[in-house]
């Protein structure tokens, strides 16, 4: 029975943990860096077995409830990747509480806004996070305080005390229903202040099924998830997570020797990394002999990185680049061999192929419109080959942002189905099209399109044309002026080691490249930039809004 007396069907991402603990009690669920060996590499001597993860998260769930953090309570979690992070997350799911996750590396003013918007009743964090909460007045609504580590002047209890208080309480699992709120996950904020995406339990369960089926993930595998929240899926899939020795907020600066050491020592069979991290491994150039499945998401993966990573993997391994967003993941996916085959088209201005839609998602392309669309009856669906906004409806499609009504109206469309039911369609905020083979192509963010007097230009149909120059690391198309009359400007970041004095020659070559394609022939302004701003989560999404402001300030 649910809290209101109605019968409910249990739906909870933690529901599979007790079964896995019975089936494979001694299998390592989480392996963390821990101390250092004589060679300076992490010892990875801090582990949790499935039995330990299940039993200890039971105790913590019971203890949290005793301290007022139970069903429906929103709890900010600011804990570094560690055994405590995973114990807490599964304990909160078991308790029916609602963890709130925000990227700690975002602008501090934006971070405060996110935490205040979430209106949490509890704040769980390491001492540094608790100190910042006190000094910066984060989350003033939080009255239940749990410190992971030593507790000082800020009150509350320690996680160790919580676990002791819940010890012996037995199995814990709230009878959450599919539509109950499971978590609030904030977006990366690459297009503004991060938004809190409301995840219901059915969204998490749906993601597990889509990931298992799309990528054939089998229990017993060993995963190296370089984005910690993704590691939460591993215990539900029966995998071992090896938490890498790196700063997850700065994947572009990860030490490839440390990553390779972990993958070799523990026989890592699965790897997830942002395009920035994949470039680190690609440039390191050491084979990855045990990896059978590599995935990369967060931004389009440059074709040269795809080719290099594929060369480091075994011949029968697969390198997938899923397409999606915090609001809906995965939407589509493409394997490296297919991506390689579309490289020529991408570098000629076709956009980036993101592959076939992951079933049972339904993806449709609609006419570009910057206004809110309340009802699906008000949209115009485009035919194959026409560029428009990408929309998706499916089991992982979230339906609202927390305390962001305007953002919800702009991103969600209500659709009445033929059977009389209603569903939510998510507007991805991306533009793209379907080709004749039913593959989805990504052309860039809707807000990043440049509206010139002769028509729109889309970033992913422009930048790859210029990125082929050997002295160019990456480019970014921005618009200067009023939409409809914007001047397209190409910002250029040179490869490391290329002198600024070489830019005049590079610019001449880029002009010739642009002139060879009708849609880029009108780009007449090229600006060298020392280093593009990128998102904090994946270090891969270019901050084009900031670049556009910068470009407008440069002398003609």
From Swiss-Prot:
Its main location: cytoplasm. It comes from the Bacteria. It is found in: Cytoplasm. Gene3D superfamilies: N-terminal domain of ligase-like (3.40.50.12780). Its EC number is 6.1.3.1. One of its GO terms (cellular component) is cytoplasm. ATP binds at residues 187-195, 321-326, 430, 445. GO terms for molecular function: ATP binding; medium-chain fatty acid-CoA ligase activity. PROSITE patterns: AMP_BINDING (PS00455). SUPFAM superfamilies: Acetyl-CoA synthetase-like. GO terms for biological process: fatty acid metabolic process. Pfam families: AMP-binding. CDD domains: FACL_like_1. InterPro entries: AMP-binding_CS, AMP-dep_synth/lig_dom, ANL_N_sf, ATP-dep_AMP-bd_enzyme, OlefBLtnSyn. It catalyses: a (2R,3S)-2-alkyl-3-hydroxyalkanoate + ATP = a cis-3-alkyl-4-alkyloxetan-2-one + AMP + diphosphate. Keywords: ATP-binding, Cytoplasm, Ligase, Nucleotide-binding. NCBIfam families: OlefBLtnSynXan (NF045786), PRK09274.1 (NF006754). Monomer. Forms a complex with OleB and OleD. Involved in olefin biosynthesis. Catalyzes the conversion of 2-alkyl-3-hydroxyalkanoic acids to beta-lactones in the presence of ATP. PANTHER family: LONG-CHAIN-FATTY-ACID--COA LIGASE, NONRIBOSOMAL PEPTIDE SYNTHASE PES1 (EUROFUNG)-RELATED. Belongs to the ATP-dependent AMP-binding enzyme family. This is Olefin beta-lactone synthetase. It comes from Xanthomonas campestris pv. campestris (strain ATCC 33913 / DSM 3586 / NCPPB 528 / LMG 568 / P 25). The gene is oleC.
């Amino acid at each position: 029975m649910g809290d209101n007396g109605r019968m409910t069907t249990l739906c909870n991402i933690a529901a599979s943990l007790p079964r896995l603990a019975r089936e494979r009690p001694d299998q390592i669920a989480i392996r963390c860096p821990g101390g250092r060996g004589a060679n300076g590499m992490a010892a990875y001597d801090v582990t949790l077995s499935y039995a330990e993860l299940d039993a200890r998260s039971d105790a913590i769930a019971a203890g949290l409830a005793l301290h007022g953090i139970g069903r429906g309570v929103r709890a900010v979690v600011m804990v570094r990747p560690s055994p405590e992070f995973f114990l807490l997350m599964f304990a909160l799911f078991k308790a029916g509480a609602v963890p709130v996750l925000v990227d700690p590396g975002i602008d501090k003013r934006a971070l405060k806004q996110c935490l205040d918007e979430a209106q949490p009743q509890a704040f769980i964090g390491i001492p540094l996070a608790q100190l910042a909460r006190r000094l910066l007045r984060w989350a003033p609504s939080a009255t239940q305080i749990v410190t992971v580590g030593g507790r000082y002047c800020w009150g509350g209890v320690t996680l160790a005390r919580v676990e002791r208080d819940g010890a012996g309480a037995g199995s814990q699992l709230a009878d959450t229903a599919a539509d109950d709120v499971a978590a609030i996950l904030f977006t990366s904020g690459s297009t503004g202040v991060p938004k809190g995406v409301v995840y219901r339990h059915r969204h998490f369960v749906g993601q597990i099924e889509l990931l298992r089926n799309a990528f054939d993930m089998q229990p017993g595998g060993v995963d190296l998830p370089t984005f910690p929240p993704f590691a939460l899926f591993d215990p539900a899939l029966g995998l071992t997570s090896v938490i890498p020795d790196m700063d997850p907020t700065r994947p572009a600066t990860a030490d490839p020797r440390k990553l390779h050491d972990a993958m070799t020592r523990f026989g890592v069979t699965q790897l997830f990394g942002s395009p920035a991290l994949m470039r680190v491994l690609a440039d390191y150039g050491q084979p990855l002999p045990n990896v059978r499945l590599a995935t990369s998401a967060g931004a389009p993966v440059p074709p040269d990185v795809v080719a290099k990573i594929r060369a480091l993997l075994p011949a029968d391994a697969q390198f997938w680049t899923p397409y999606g967003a915090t609001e809906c993941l995965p939407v589509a996916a493409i394997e490296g061999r297919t991506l390689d085959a579309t490289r020529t088209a991408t570098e000629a201005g076709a956009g980036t192929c993101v592959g076939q839609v992951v079933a049972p998602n339904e993806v449709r392309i609609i006419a570009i419109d910057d206004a809110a669309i309340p009802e699906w009856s008000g949209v115009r669906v485009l035919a194959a080959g026409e560029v428009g906004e990408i929309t998706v409806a499916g089991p992982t499609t979230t339906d609202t942002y927390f305390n962001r009504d305007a953002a919800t109206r702009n991103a969600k469309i209500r659709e009445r189905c033929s059977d009389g039911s209603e569903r939510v369609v998510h507007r991805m905020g991306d533009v793209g099209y379907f080709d004749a083979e039913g593959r989805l192509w990504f052309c860039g963010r809707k807000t990043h399109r440049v509206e010139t007097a002769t028509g729109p230009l889309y970033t992913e149909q422009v930048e790859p044309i210029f990125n082929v120059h050997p002295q160019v690391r990456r480019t970014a198309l921005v618009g200067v002026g009023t939409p409809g009359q914007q001047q397209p400007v190409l910002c250029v970041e040179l490869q490391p080691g290329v002198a600024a004095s070489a830019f005049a020659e590079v610019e001449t070559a880029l002009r010739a490249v642009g002139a060879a394609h009708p849609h880029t022939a009108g780009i007449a302004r090229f600006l060298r930039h020392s280093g593009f701003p990128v998102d904090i989560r994946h270090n891969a999404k270019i901050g084009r809004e900031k670049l556009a402001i910068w470009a407008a300030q440069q002398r003609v």
